[in-house]
Amino acid sequence: MIDIHSHIVFDVDDGPKTLEESLSLIEESYRQGVRIIVSTSHRRKGMFETPEDIIFKNFSIVKHEAEKRFEHLQILYGGELYYTSDMLEKLKLKQIPTLNNTKFALIEFSMQTSWKDIHTALSNVLMLGITPVVAHIERYNSLENQKERVKEIINMGCYTQINSSHILKQKLFNDKHKRFKKRARYFLEENLVHFVASDMHNLDVRPPFLAEAYKIICRDFGKERANQLFIENAQSILKNHYI
């Protein structure tokens, strides 16, 4: 499998704190069958402002150690880019990364961002000649039960991603992700999803659930659809090809 959304680089955002934590997280992903991981550390003004050279330095250490330790594993460079006018300018100047240096970029918003602001932001990114992959679309309140809005995003030329943790079955009690899981299922049933990715941060609170999610998609939507969501679509964009 291929994971295009992950926080595996130590000491740069809210992901791993140490190299060993990075490697333990990658080991679990590898155990689940992932062989390509795109590292997408946060870039968010006012919250995650680690200098780009530090992120790349720590990424390079993680890549070297992980690829040495795990056979046939590839770690690629990217970023989860929180949309602001500052981010747009940095993207234009190539100061922050797309996914594996392609024309595709992982773009994030706050849960409360309005539909109008999401639409405007994505239009602005598209005008740079960059195709947005909208991170975890199930988290945005303005898209809840709004298949027409998500269709519009896709028709504009964007792609969509949901988190593997939100594909898992709802817990009977105290499932704080219940709302996200309902939204993710809705988008899957409406065929409005291009990628499932882990958005993994650590092994205790936000681990990868790709193996379990893959089984559920196979069971409910078929193996062909599962392979598109977990492997084939990601293969395309990482080679800089449209889906």
From Swiss-Prot:
It holds the Pfam family CpsB_CapC. Signal peptide: none annotated. It catalyses: O-phospho-L-tyrosyl-[protein] + H2O = L-tyrosyl-[protein] + phosphate. It is an enzyme of class 3 (hydrolase). Pathway: Capsule biogenesis; capsule polysaccharide biosynthesis. Keywords: Capsule biogenesis/degradation, Exopolysaccharide synthesis, Hydrolase, Manganese, Protein phosphatase. Its EC number is 3.1.3.48. Its cofactor is Mn(2+). GO terms for molecular function: manganese ion binding; protein tyrosine phosphatase activity. GO terms for biological process: capsule polysaccharide biosynthetic process. PANTHER family: TYROSINE-PROTEIN PHOSPHATASE YWQE. Dephosphorylates CpsD. Involved in the regulation of capsular polysaccharide biosynthesis. Belongs to the metallo-dependent hydrolases superfamily. CpsB/CapC family. NCBIfam families: caps_synth_Cps4B. This is Tyrosine-protein phosphatase CpsB. The lineage of its organism: Bacteria, Bacillati, Bacillota, Bacilli, Lactobacillales.
